[in-house]
Amino acid sequence: MAPKRGGRAPVPAKKKTEKVTNPLFEKRPKQFGIGGALPPKKDLHRFVKWPKVVRIQRQRRILKQRLKVPPALNQFTRTLDKNLATNLFKMLLKYRPEDKAAKKERLLKRAQAEAEGKTVEAKKPIVVKYGLNHVTYLIEQSKAQLVVIAHDVDPIELVVWLPALCRKMEVPYCIVKGKARLGSIVHKKTASVLCLTTVKNEDKLEFSKILEAIKANFNDKFDEVRKKWGGGVMGSKSQAKTKAREKLLAKEAAQRMT
């Protein structure tokens, strides 16, 4: 028979050596209570006293998670996906309205031409329309081809009815992040809503693709959106208490059964 290959030899158990302490030194554990020893360094981020504006922003965000949010308001949490939003903003930037400097230059050239006795053909430029009242009028007159709404308008009541109006008039609409980005397109700090009435011939193919995708994401999903409530998410402590209570009730019910 072939010799058996044995494993490693058992390691002898180490003897525990008792630590010799000097009886002259007393053991004084630190008390980290009020007026006691300084606590060890740790992350104190949550105890920072933030500025009032930041505090209100945080409280509003938490409150939106805790309270039940009706579907009309909850729809503003569903925004356009990043890739489609990038293509949309590229399109909107092509139709930016002129700023003050460009307008001044155009009027100066026109005045010079008129002074020389030339006839100037003034073509109406194709630009992005903005302003809530103006956009509403364009939707009601069925002139709007696409409506872009900001998700963070404050107060939200200004635009909460706009998606319903767009659906009624069968105008494609989308909700994007955020009002500052929309404002930068029209040379303003913020803009709650933008609108395109028409595009140039070379952009029509790309624009039709964007419209199709937006319709599929927003106009066609109306039945889902109008039923979906938001919020109602409690904090971690509250969830832990609820779980413990449910566990206790389940245990009592099991005991009654036996």
Swiss-Prot record:
Pfam families: Ribosomal_L7Ae (PF01248). SUPFAM superfamilies: L30e-like. One of its GO terms (biological process) is ribosome biogenesis. It comes from the Eukaryota. Residues 1-20 are annotated as: Disordered. The keyword Ribosomal protein applies. GO terms for cellular component: ribonucleoprotein complex; ribosome. InterPro entries: eL8/uL1-like, Ribosomal_eL30-like_sf, Ribosomal_eL8-like_CS, Ribosomal_eL8/eL30/eS12/Gad45, Ribosomal_eL8/Nhp2, Ribosomal_eL8_euk. One of its GO terms (molecular function) is RNA binding. Keywords: Ribonucleoprotein, Ribosomal protein. Belongs to the eukaryotic ribosomal protein eL8 family. This is Large ribosomal subunit protein eL8z. It comes from Oryza sativa subsp. japonica. The gene is RPL7A-1.
